[in-house]
UniProtKB/Swiss-Prot annotation:
Domain of life per record: Eukaryota
Cleavable signal peptide: 1-18
InterPro entries referenced in this protein's UniProt entry, alphabetically: Serum_amyloid_A, Synovial_Prolif_Regulator
UniProt keyword annotations, A-Z: Acute phase, Amyloid, HDL, Heparin-binding, Secreted, Signal
Cellular component aspect of the GO annotation: high-density lipoprotein particle
Protein name: Serum amyloid A-1 protein
Entry's induction text: Up-regulated by inflammatory stimuli.
Similarity-based family: Belongs to the SAA family.
Amino acid sequence: MKPFVAIIFCFLILGVDSQRWFQFMKEAGQGTRDMWRAYTDMREANWKNSDKYFHARGNYDAAQRGPGGAWAAKVISDAREGFKRITGRGIEDSRADQFANEWGRSGKDPNFFRPPGLPSKY
């Protein structure tokens, strides 16, 4: 049922034509994996002041997939930051995170936010 709803959503709201809906959904799935990978890398690195870098990197990687990836990155980022605002945790930090999210989605280099000393693995 959920894939069917997503497909209908793409047709009606996003204006994805019948030739591109499969590609859009594929990009969205890949973008979701990119966002998850950035999150797990952030947790694994556990590096001070690195969250903006991982936000930007996840959004950048997802957006590089195409319109579906950029859409998935925006939905995930907005949901995450919206949850922070609802719970009242760090409104200023949430704004900074959104700036990093938009920076990455726009195709700008996420290394702008890279903290000194972060291992090259990330």
